[in-house]
Regions:
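Conserved functional hotspots at enzyme active or ligand-binding sites that engage polyanionic ligands
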Residues: 1-99
Length: 99
């Protein structure tokens, strides 16, 4: 399952780590998608909530995928559920116009 961490970005915010777990120990930077409580209903968003370790309804914003230093990640607060992986795939396809 993909982990959700708090990360020190423009401010401390939750992020979904997209870099595969197998290679993370060898990298100094990881790819993440910021999580926000601003829900716009875009095809590039994945809905999250308490089941993901978040205190309120939020979305993964696949329009804002970034690379961050691994040491910017603070602590794991939750994870993406297996049932949400398909929505993540669709959101990434939409964000990068892969369809």
């Amino acid at each position: 399952m993909r982990p959700i961490y708090t990360a020190r970005l423009d401010k401390t915010r939750p992020v979904l780590v997209l870099t595969r777990e197998l290679v993370r120990p060898y990298l100094t930077r990881v790819t993440v998608a910021p999580i926000t409580t601003t829900i716009r209903g875009l095809s590039t968003e994945v809905l999250l909530g308490r089941a993901n370790g978040l205190p309120e309804p939020s979305v993964v914003s696949c329009d804002n995928i970034i690379l961050v230093p691994k040491n910017a990640l603070d602590r794991q607060i939750g994870c993406l559920l297996p049932t949400q992986e398909e929505a993540l795939t669709a959101a990434i396809h939409a964000a990068f116009d892969l369809d």
